[in-house]
Regions:
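N-terminal helical cap/lid subdomain that shapes the substrate entry/recognition surface
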Residues: 1-61, 68-69, 80-83
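Acidic, low-complexity intrinsically disordered regions
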Residues: 9, 19, 44, 75, ...
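Short, well-ordered coil/turn segments that N-cap beta-strands
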Residues: 71-73
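Asp-based, Mg2+/Mn2+-dependent phosphohydrolase catalytic module
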Residues: 64, 76, 80-179
């Protein structure tokens, strides 16, 4: 399985769907290149939900606290336009965002500066007044080049501490509602 995910349905191939390539086209290309793995390639597509790691509970709790405090919430994700609607159904907390820019819909992926600019322009965000959180150092570096404050996410505890330092959360508080 590790070989299959490294050599066939790898991150570079998956990023092409995140950039807007239709899944049917992406899987057809792989089936032509790896006909002996056609069944697994098709299964990867039809069973992709099983590859999702799920939400990080501590992060969802932080998001709930920010929402409860009235903090404006926007999101930017590298995700296929075909599969993101399913993620919206699986993860109710995605409804808490005022807006979400999805790479597959924009035909751009992070860390391309154009996708960050699109978010800033679409939602009239002042880069100097925004905090961008990502688990990728290269994505954080990209937003910092645009004048945004970036935070490289490692774990919910570190994020919570940083948000307390910025005055966005209070020390020792936790939201209990996840509506």
């Amino acid at each position: 399985m590790e070989w299959f995910l490294r050599e066939v349905c790898n991150s570079e191939w998956n990023e092409q769907q995140d950039a807007g390539r239709p899944w049917a086209e992406g899987t057809a290309l792989l089936r032509a290149r790896f006909p002996e793995h056609a069944g697994l390639i098709d299964a990867y597509h039809t069973r992709w939900k099983e590859t999702l790691l799920g939400p990080i509970d501590g992060s969802v709790a932080i998001l709930a606290e920010l929402k409860a405090r009235g903090v404006r919430l926007l999101a930017l994700t590298n995700w296929s336009q075909e599969t993101f609607p399913v993620a919206r159904q699986l993860y109710p907390f995605l409804q808490w965002f005022e807006g979400i820019v999805v790479s597959g819909e924009e035909r751009l992926v992070k860390p391309d500066l154009r996708i960050y600019r699109r978010l800033l322009e679409r939602y009239a965000v002042d880069p100097a007044a925004a905090l961008y959180i990502d688990d990728s150092a290269r994505n954080v570096a990209a937003v910092e080049a645009l004048g945004m404050h970036g935070w490289w996410f490692h774990d919910p505890a570190g994020l919570r501490e940083h948000l307390v330092e910025l005055g966005l959360l209070e020390r020792g508080t936790r939201a209990t509602s996840r509506d």
